[in-house]
Amino acid sequence: MRIQFSKMHGLGNDFVVIDAIHQPVDLSPDQVRLLAHRRFGVGCDQVLLVERPSDPAAADFRYRIFNADGNEVEQCGNGARCFAVFVRERGLTAKDHIPVETAAGIIHLQVQPDGQVTVDMGPPRLKPWQIPFEAESAMTSYPLEVEGETYEIGAVSMGNPHAVLRVDNVQTAPVARLGPLIEAHPRFPRHVNVGFMQVVSPGEIRLRVYERGVGETLACGTGACAAVVSGRIQGLLDETVAVDLPGGRLVINWAGQEEAPVMMTGPATQVFTGSIDI
């Protein structure tokens, strides 16, 4: 079948975005992997589908996310910003405020006058069973043994699971070595995204993220949210934090209460449109 798509990115975290409302789309894991392949397909970190919501009274669209390995996942913050720009540029909505259904629940997208997008990611989930993470009780950080060494990590779900490891220098952090080991750690039964966070000041961090099913990406929106939440509950960060990722900067705001939503603001860019037979 021939599929129309847009290639987009949020700070270099790139996506193939597909309108599945006005064209029939039913992707197998093999087809997702082909679309995501950077030599034989279009090339991307994730494939995003725009679908009709299951409950039109609660949301305007359904947002589905597939990693480059073909697996469907619950949430992607950078993708959410691209989703908002896509549905506006394609004329699917004229709204500035867009409620969207995801596998992790309803999120709210707000297109700002300058074109940036603020995403209400909802409240973080901090209890181990919500992440999911094997631990007896909720803590601000947890010891995690990896190949005989013990690391102190934060564990947060932003609709998808995240481990956050504080490092002295993000540039020299062992992302390629530790990332896949923590991602597949048995205490994370559904695997986990791994953030390496350097605290510059209470209002600024530097972050690299090893995404499950993808590897290291230039930016990760939910990873930025999780890092700020983890740093804030440990008393390291302010309510509003600039997060510098390899692909650029996001601004994250979280009041600090467990029930308070995490707000993420950043850009989204369309690179090109096209079609592909798969």
UniProtKB/Swiss-Prot annotation:
It comes from Thioalkalivibrio sulfidiphilus (strain HL-EbGR7). GO terms for biological process: lysine biosynthetic process via diaminopimelate. It is found in: Cytoplasm. Its EC number is 5.1.1.7. It comes from the Bacteria. Substrate binds at N13, Q46, N67, G77, N78, N160, N193, E211, R212, G221, T222. InterPro entries: DAP_epimerase_AS (IPR018510), DAP_epimerase_DapF (IPR001653). The gene is dapF. Keywords: Amino-acid biosynthesis, Cytoplasm, Isomerase, Lysine biosynthesis. Coiled coil: none annotated. The active site is at C76 (proton donor), C220 (proton acceptor). PROSITE patterns: DAP_EPIMERASE (PS01326). This is Diaminopimelate epimerase. Its main location: cytoplasm. One of its GO terms (molecular function) is diaminopimelate epimerase activity. Belongs to the diaminopimelate epimerase family. GO terms for cellular component: cytosol. Pathway: Amino-acid biosynthesis; L-lysine biosynthesis via DAP pathway; DL-2,6-diaminopimelate from LL-2,6-diaminopimelate: step 1/1.
